């Protein structure tokens, strides 16, 4: 378990959504990866996931960040100090695509150790499924394109992480 605010976020998420799987992995990152910027070694947290319309469609975004490489992403991003995983999800989705969410469900937490060989930084990603309160997309300033899909795009970042959740959305199991 992680210390301090990290532990508080984890406890809050489990209290609200029940215990979910925690997937652990290590990823090699280049020395200029944003995770290594700054002096903090505290774990970082992000929230995101599949935002669906209730009819099996999910929304993905493309950002203008060069590091994104033109790939599609789920809406989401880094949490602010003191922000809970679900509050961060709602804020990020509102900022990125202009949509309010209903009934977010936490499906897993991914604990990733990023290393460049010399340094290691830990991050936690709270992965959700949530229903969109509207289907009208209003991309924010960081988003260059937002679109509804009825399948996972081949160039979706972290595509394998979303296979199971997408299947749940498509079959409307529990949602």
Regions found by a protein language model. Give the residues of each.
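NUDIX/MutT-family hydrolases
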Residues: 127, 138-170
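Conserved hydrophobic/aromatic beta-strand scaffold that supports enzyme active sites
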Residues: 50, 60, 127-129, 148
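Glycine- and small hydrophobic-enriched segments that form the cores of compact globular domains
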Residues: 94, 108-116, 146
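Conserved Nudix-box catalytic region and its N-terminal flanking loop in Nudix hydrolases
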Residues: 57-95
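Active-site-adjacent beta-strand/loop module that shapes the phosphate/pyrophosphate-binding cleft
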Residues: 53-55, 110-136
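A generic structural micro-feature
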Residues: 41-43, 71, 118-124, 143
């Amino acid at each position: 378990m992680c210390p301090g605010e990290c532990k508080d976020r984890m406890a809050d998420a489990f209290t609200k959504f029940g215990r979910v799987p925690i997937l652990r992995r290590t990823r090699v990152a280049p020395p200029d990866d944003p995770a290594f910027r700054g002096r903090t070694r505290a774990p970082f947290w992000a929230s995101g996931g599949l935002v669906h319309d209730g009819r099996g469609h999910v929304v993905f975004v493309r950002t203008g960040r060069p590091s994104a490489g033109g790939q599609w992403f789920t809406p989401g991003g880094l949490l602010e100090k003191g922000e809970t995983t679900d509050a961060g999800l709602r804020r990020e989705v509102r900022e990125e695509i202009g949509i309010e969410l209903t009934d977010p469900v936490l499906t897993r937490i991914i604990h990733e150790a990023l290393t460049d060989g010399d340094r290691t930084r830990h991050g936690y990603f709270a992965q959700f499924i949530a229903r969109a309160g509207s289907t009208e997309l209003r991309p924010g300033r960081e988003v260059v394109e937002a679109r509804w899909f009825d399948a996972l795009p081949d160039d979706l970042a972290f595509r394998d992480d979303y296979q199971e959740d997408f299947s749940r959305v498509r079959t409307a199991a529990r949602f």
